[in-house]
Regions:
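Beta-propeller folds
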Residues: 1-351
Length: 351
């Protein structure tokens, strides 16, 4: 009889346990990717069977072929208590819904060709993890910092949300989209411990510093002026390199139907494609998607958990209606001697 009661209780508790554990996936490794020569692998994992906050881990073997797992980046260490109460941009929420992603913290990442640099977002902030090796033991080392945080804070309307960041294969740049603009981040030098970089004074204008004083030379290159002890290190810099109209024909941003650098609804929901731009292997070219949803019907969706919130309109195709008009464009990028973005040298529509 006791065994029967145990089975009955287990069946009754199954829906709750399934929900609390994200279908029994919490605490299990996922999103694994081999890096470098294939002897190491990155993966995501939370700390327990009901912990939703996933961290970035590294799987590796030492010289005696013993296996190890090292945590590289922990959202709770980077953000503290706010890692458990996410503030996710609307477009990112939509992507996660289509990908059936219910986790928090680091839910996706992008790694360069050598497997030395990894980028990801937490709570809409952009982070970089660098992976190294201990010279004495050969064990992996890591350090993590936020990328271009001053830029995001200076003009959030321009530079956010940070969606779908992808690091270049050469590890020198990060590309992300706001939905309206493709943003390219020049990765600066790593600050000395206890000496965070400061963005030089001056107003931001589409990724270029202006109205700076004479001592702040070469700001368009992201440099500080020369001092007695030599050049100061390069800082992070964000530039909008391509965009679509942020307003409709009547000047109303709420009704704008164009997006750039994102996958249209059908691609995510039916094709499991969530990327809307791609780096070339040599990091010199970018292929990106832009699309117009003007011909798709609008659906108004309410949030049962927040009945005081007004229903939001979203354009979704349905049977016998039009899909979005999708376009592909390839651009060629130019960089200076410091690997800083210097402009677009060519572009072509390919579809």
């Amino acid at each position: 009889m006791s065994e029967t009661n145990d089975v009955t209780d287990a069946i009754a508790n199954l829906p709750r346990r399934r929900a609390r554990t994200l279908r029994f996936t919490c605490g299990a490794p996922r999103s694994a990717q081999t890096i470098g020569n294939g002897s190491r692998a990155l993966f995501l994992r939370s700390d327990g069977p009901e912990d939703l906050v996933t961290a970035l881990w590294l799987s590796w073997f030492d010289d005696s072929s013993e296996h190890h797992e090292t945590k590289l980046a922990d959202p709770r260490e980077l953000l503290g208590a706010t890692a458990d109460s996410e503030n996710v941009p609307t477009e990112e929420k939509a992507r996660r819904e289509r990908a059936r992603e219910g986790g928090a913290g680091i839910v996706s990442y992008s790694v360069d060709a050598d497997g030395d640099r990894v980028v990801f977002t937490i709570n809409g902030r952009l982070f970089l993890t660098e992976i190294g090796n201990d010279a004495a033991t050969g064990a992996p080392t890591s350090r993590t910092r936020e990328l271009a945080g001053e830029w995001l804070d200076e003009d959030p309307a321009m530079y956010t949300p940070v969606l779908n960041p992808r690091i270049a294969p050469d590890g020198e740049h990060v590309l992300y989209t706001t939905g309206t603009y493709l943003m390219l981040v020049d990765i600066g030098d790593w600050p000395a411990e206890g000496e965070p970089f400061e963005v030089p004074e001056g107003e931001l204008d589409n990724g270029v510093e202006v109205e700076a004083d004479a001592e702040e030379s070469a700001l368009s290159e992201g440099l500080y002026g020369d001092e007695e002890d030599g050049d100061q290190p390069l800082t992070d810099r964000i530039t909008a390199i391509y965009g679509v109209s942020a307003e409709d024909e009547d000047g109303n941003p709420a009704d704008n139907t164009w997006k750039i650098g994102l996958a249209e609804f059908v691609a995510g929901e039916e094709m499991d494609r969530y990327d809307g731009f791609w780096w070339s292997p040599d990091s010199q070219h970018v292929l990106f998607e832009s699309f117009d949803t003007a011909d798709e019907p609008t659906w108004y969706i309410s949030d049962p958990a927040n009945p005081e919130t007004a229903a939001t309109g979203r354009r979704y195709p349905r049977a016998l209606t039009r899909n979005a008009d999708v376009y592909l464009t390839v651009i060629s990028l130019a960089f200076d001697e410091n690997y800083r973005y210097a402009g677009i040298t060519g572009n072509a529509d390919v579809a």
